[in-house]
């Protein structure tokens, strides 16, 4: 009888966790004129089949004490519909049979996935609560083409990989299973058996929409319906987002935030603030400081806090450190209501090699390159995404789309682009593989980045999504259109400007005359790309010192130099980015497990720097001359670029209607009276900004709020004014 109801070979394969097709033996099957039901339920004591109204249809006999049951059930000739009544040692369960359901995913959708369609990733993969034939449950689907068996495990089956082996959908390599009777909130992972027979450590879902909070590592079934039905209130914001060339003409002043440490809750074991708590505190702060955007360091779930988020393992899930995923949607909605844009750092270059993650996901190099000369990053000991693989490229593009669609983010900043573009990045001779032409350019990454930008700027994404590249080399055309051979980004971080100017300011003022070109060189290439000027977290960590600590001199000189630098930066062509804590001149470096030193704001000097940044932001946003032509040479002209003996710089900013702002910077502690400056218009000029104002912590030296441009030629202009230049300060002048 056992041989008739349940083949011994099937039993052995199922119990060993290596059956190639569990649906071929489990669930209902016709045998002559009977319906035979087979079930694998390790630990069960008794199993019966019931009709939907509770009538008994038959008993499933135990055909193997390890948990195999089989029996015939009464039927009316149609498709059998039954429930399994299971007696466990300490519980009773009535459930639909997962193996009574047919295939789940449409063949056409799977074909689109194999062809590299990111929409198919979003449509097919992950854990999705669904209803099938009036039965609620969760559809699981995961890509693992080299595995010989995949099971979904969780609290619902005691994490036993024998209980829910999945169906392989050839040729896509996607495994699927509908588990009835469970829903949102369930914890789960996948158990995979590699081609060589190894049972791998349980893997988190690469496409999970939600996760457990670290250090726990399970994926969580998200309430997809609730996410889709989220009551957004930002239609006006979304429709008004600047499109195409307009996005380059508006002010961008970005406050970069490490959300895990911006504020913590000391009375609750010093935990991180939730998204709702951040909405209450961070949004008003950003708004009050005059920033236009907040940019979060990576928030996709990451296991190691010390990575600051730059080693994510759940590309689709906001970190559970900050509460449920809906909390992030609420944060973005409230930010938009306050007129604040939200950017997120996004990491497509590499991923950590944690056992529960993507590395060797199905026992093979699935997401990474197989050759360590391509697949391992020597600096970070991480795995490099194989973006040349169709499905991997689609997976990453789908992730970017998900952030734009599900959470209405206004843009992504793509991390470590240089490491993607060069095959020999941070590698010695013999440690890298040339491209098909023998060169060092990573052609697959170039194609991926172009595709990413075309997708986010196309009809698939909400209009107005912005992409920013952290690219530290001179790769040409990072912000050029893909149609013209460029990578298609909207903006690129100007790392060269940042390194040069900080190196200049690190010099003692008496020596700055010998390094004058560091401050002017950035204008040689300032309009070759569309730039963001980044004073980011990278510059205030790992022994580099905080911004103010980089400056020489006593405390007053350091603070004054930083204020002058901020005045120079906010007047310089390019959008602005400032890392948290720098806006009030924090003395210590960034520490991911400690908040910024907010107590410094008890000191007037630090409150003054904070007040200056606020006023710079407000003036920058209010004055089109300072932002409308940030990306065009017509918006900038040197007035004084060669006064290296006095370490003085002066330049004019203008918009295309003729509005003017002139910035004058004195980077020595020597006040300079009677300094003649050529000006592009005659008459009365008022001081729009003076970083040496007493309210900012300065000496209040200056020009009593105004100067007069008379008909005395200077610096190539027909008019000029005699100025008093405060020590270590920047002035902004505008025609009255």
UniProtKB/Swiss-Prot annotation:
A GO cellular component term found in this entry reads: cytosol
Task: Identify one Pfam family in the record.
Answer: CBM_48
Which species does this protein come from?
Burkholderia cenocepacia (strain HI2424)
UniProt lists the gene as glgB
Could you tell me the Gene Ontology terms of the biological process aspect for this record?
glycogen biosynthetic process
Catalytic site: 415, 470
Task: Specify the protein name.
Answer: 1,4-alpha-glucan branching enzyme GlgB
Q: Which UniProt keywords apply?
A: Carbohydrate metabolism, Glycogen biosynthesis, Glycogen metabolism, Glycosyltransferase, Transferase
Tell me its family: Belongs to the glycosyl hydrolase 13 family. GlgB subfamily.
Any idea which GO molecular function terms this record carries? 1,4-alpha-glucan branching enzyme activity; cation binding; hydrolase activity, hydrolyzing O-glycosyl compounds
Q: Which domain of life is it from?
A: Bacteria
Please give the coiled-coil regions recorded for this protein.
none
Q: What is its EC number?
A: 2.4.1.18
Which reaction(s) does its UniProt entry say it catalyses? Transfers a segment of a (1->4)-alpha-D-glucan chain to a primary hydroxy group in a similar glucan chain
């Amino acid at each position: 009888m056992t041989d008739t109801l349940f083949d011994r070979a099937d039993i052995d394969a199922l119990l060993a966790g290596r059956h190639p097709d569990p649906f071929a033996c489990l669930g209902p099957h016709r045998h002559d004129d009977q319906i035979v039901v087979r079930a694998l339920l390790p630990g069960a004591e008794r199993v019966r089949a019931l009709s939907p109204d509770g009538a008994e249809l038959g008993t499933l006999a135990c055909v193997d004490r390890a948990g195999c049951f089989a029996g015939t059930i009464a039927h009316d000739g149609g498709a059998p519909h039954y429930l399994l009544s299971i007696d466990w040692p300490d519980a009773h369960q009535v459930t639909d049979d997962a193996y009574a359901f047919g295939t789940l995913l449409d063949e056409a959708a799977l074909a689109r996935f194999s062809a590299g369609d990111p929409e198919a990733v979003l449509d097919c993969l992950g854990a999705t609560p669904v209803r099938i034939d009036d039965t609620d449950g969760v559809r699981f689907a995961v890509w693992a083409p080299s595995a010989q068996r995949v099971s979904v495990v969780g609290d619902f089956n005691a994490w036993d990989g024998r209980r829910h082996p999945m169906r392989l959908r050839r040729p896509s390599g996607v495994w699927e299973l509908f588990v009835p009777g469970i829903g949102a909130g369930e914890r789960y992972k996948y158990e995979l058996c590699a081609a060589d027979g190894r049972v791998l450590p349980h893997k988190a879902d690469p496409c999970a929409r939600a996760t457990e909070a670290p250090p726990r590592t399970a994926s969580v079934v998200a309430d997809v319906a609730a996410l889709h039905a989220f009551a957004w209130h930002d239609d006006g914001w979304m429709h008004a987002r600047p499109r195409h060339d307009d996005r380059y003409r508006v002010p961008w002043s970005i406050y970069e935030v490490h959300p895990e440490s911006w504020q913590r809750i000391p009375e609750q074991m010093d935990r991180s603030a939730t998204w709702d708590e951040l909405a209450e505190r961070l949004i008003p702060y950003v708004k009050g400081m005059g920033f236009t955007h907040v940019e979060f360091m990576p928030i996709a779930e990451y296991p190691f806090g010390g990575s600051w988020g730059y080693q994510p393992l759940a590309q689709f899930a906001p970190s559970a450190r900050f509460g449920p995923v809906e909390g992030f949607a609420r944060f973005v909605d409230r930010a938009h209501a306050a007129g604040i844009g939200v950017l997120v750092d996004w990491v497509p270059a590499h991923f950590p090699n944690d056992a529960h993650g993507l590395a060797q996901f199905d026992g093979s190099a699935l997401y990474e390159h197989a050759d360590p000369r391509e697949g391992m990053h020597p600096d970070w000991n991480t795995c490099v995404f194989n973006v040349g693989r169709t499905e991997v490229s689609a997976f990453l593009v789908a992730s970017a789309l998900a952030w734009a669609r599900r959470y209405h983010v206004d843009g992504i900043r793509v991390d470590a682009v240089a490491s993607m573009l060069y095959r020999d990045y941070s590698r010695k001779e013999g440690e890298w593989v040339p491209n098909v032409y023998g060169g060092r350019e990573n052609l697959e990454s170039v194609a991926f980045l172009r595709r990413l930008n075309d997708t986010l700027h196309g009809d698939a994404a909400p209009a107005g999504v912005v992409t920013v590249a952290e690219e530290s080399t001179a790769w040409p055309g990072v912000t050029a259109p893909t149609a013209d051979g460029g990578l298609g980004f909207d903006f690129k971080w100007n790392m060269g400007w940042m390194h040069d100017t900080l190196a200049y300011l690190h010099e003692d003022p008496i020596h700055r005359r010998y390094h004058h070109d560091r401050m002017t060189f950035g204008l040689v290439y300032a309009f070759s790309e569309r730039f963001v000027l980044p004073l980011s977290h990278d510059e205030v960590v790992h022994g580099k010192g905080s911004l103010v600590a980089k400056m020489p001199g006593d405390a007053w000189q350091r603070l004054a130099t930083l204020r002058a630098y901020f005045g120079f930066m906010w007047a310089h062509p390019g959008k602005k980015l400032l890392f948290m804590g720098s806006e009030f001149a924090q003395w210590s470096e960034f520490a991911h497990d400690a908040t910024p030193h907010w107590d410094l704001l008890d000191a007037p000097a630090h409150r003054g720097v904070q007040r200056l940044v606020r006023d710079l932001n407000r003036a920058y946003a209010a004055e089109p001359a300072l932002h409308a032509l940030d990306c065009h040479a017509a918006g900038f002209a040197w007035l004084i670029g060669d006064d290296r003996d006095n370490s003085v710089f002066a330049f004019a900013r203008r918009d295309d209607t003729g509005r003017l702002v002139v910035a004058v910077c004195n980077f020595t502690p020597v006040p300079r009276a009677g300094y003649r400056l050529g000006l592009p218009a005659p008459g009365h000029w008022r001081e729009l900004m003076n970083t040496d104002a007493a309210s900012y912590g300065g000496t209040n030296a200056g020009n009593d709020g105004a100067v007069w441009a008379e008909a005395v030629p200077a610096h190539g202009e027909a008019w000029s004014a005699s100025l008093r230049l405060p020590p270590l300060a920047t002035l902004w002048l505008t025609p009255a």
